[in-house]
Amino acid sequence: MKIVISSDIYYPMINGVAVFSRNLAAGLKKRGHKVMVIAPSITGEFSVEKDPEYGFTVARLSSNRIHVYPDQINKVPESKDFFGLKLPKLFYKNGLNVSLNCYSEVRQVLDDFEPDIIHDQTPGPVALAVFRYAKKHDIPLVSTDHAYPDNLTQQLKLPKPAKKPINSMMNKYFVSFLKRSEYATMPTEQAVADLIPNKRKPFKVPVEALSNGIDLSRFAKGQPNKEIYDKYNIPRSKPIILYVGRVDPEKSLDVLAEAFTKVAKKKQDAQLVIVGDGTAKPKLESILEKADLSEQVHFLGRVVGDDLPQIYHTGSVFAITSKTETQSIVLMEAMASGLPCVAVKAGAVHELVKNNKNGFLANPDDANSVARNILKIIDNPKLREKMSKESVARAERHDISHTLTRMEEIYQEVLANREREL
């Protein structure tokens, strides 16, 4: 098949949508399909290139920077200190790239590629252009929704009274995108239920819960290389609470920082390792500096390549306090690495973390609850080993090979339905 994967967010950005889109393209290419990814350019200039590692085609659309949000590629600039307060940046030189008026370029690359099917990942400007082309040329569409409206509205820092109506409006907007396609997927059953709560009302298109999946072999449990500790200044033989992911407001990492202050009082050699970068970092630094814990906290920034699996293996427990996860690729990576996990009872993480099995589910926004559950694991080596094995076992059902097989079946079903209609 000739498959197009379109997204407004793509590698080298590091987030769930970007990682999944590239993994999907690479996996489909490896299975013999001809694949093109369409996404905004990171330089602003239009180009068509080959992925340097996997060899599929990437069409980079002309783009403009939005300077109120960082690009998730470069290091977020350090916050300014103002009379002891750390102030976050309000203007980012390396802003997020967005392709607003991109239909002519989309038409150009798709005319040349002649796709059999298009699979969109984000309800943004690139999708609008791709949908327009698909409708005009009668090309079947598949859509995947990766986000809750909360993921976006929290970035806007809206007053509380405005959040509910805007979330409702954005929910309808997300649903409208799914309805334009012929088949839709979301990463979990919970994500489907939250976006489409009215089961009695028939939905226009089939919607299936299908895991994003990960390459399990990349994160298989093992001992980290000694060099990784020195390279990232990670202490050896100490309890390490690990977080990997964006350091942005909707991830609720202030709760994890507060929880760590409580863990450190009872476990004085405990360390917090945060892999990732984002706009919430100044707030975390302030919390941890006030608690005099800066020496026990390690902000590693963005880590990619072979170092990332090694860093997972340094951890004692993986902690994620976000309430807005539609699945969480980093949680699956942690599980595949054999880490017990502490998450919160919100979003869809309960489909990955089973309470008292491979970790614990704490109360949302409750640092005391998060701290108690972290301490249960690091204070009990036997429990930690038991939960480690359970994490690996539960991760196995999320191998990306299962996702790729089902996605191929969906594409074939959609194409077969089109042929029957002719």
Task: Annotate each predicted stretch with a short phrase.
Residues 39, 59-62, 164-225:
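Donor nucleotide-sugar binding/catalytic pocket of nucleotide-sugar-dependent glycosyltransferases
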Residues 283-303:
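Nucleotide-activated donor-binding/catalytic signature segment of Leloir-type glycosyltransferases, i.e.
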Residues 323:
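Aromatic "clamp/platform" in nucleotide-sugar-dependent glycosyltransferases that forms part
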Residues 355-356, 360-367, 376-382:
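Conserved acidic donor-binding segment of nucleotide-sugar-dependent glycosyltransferases
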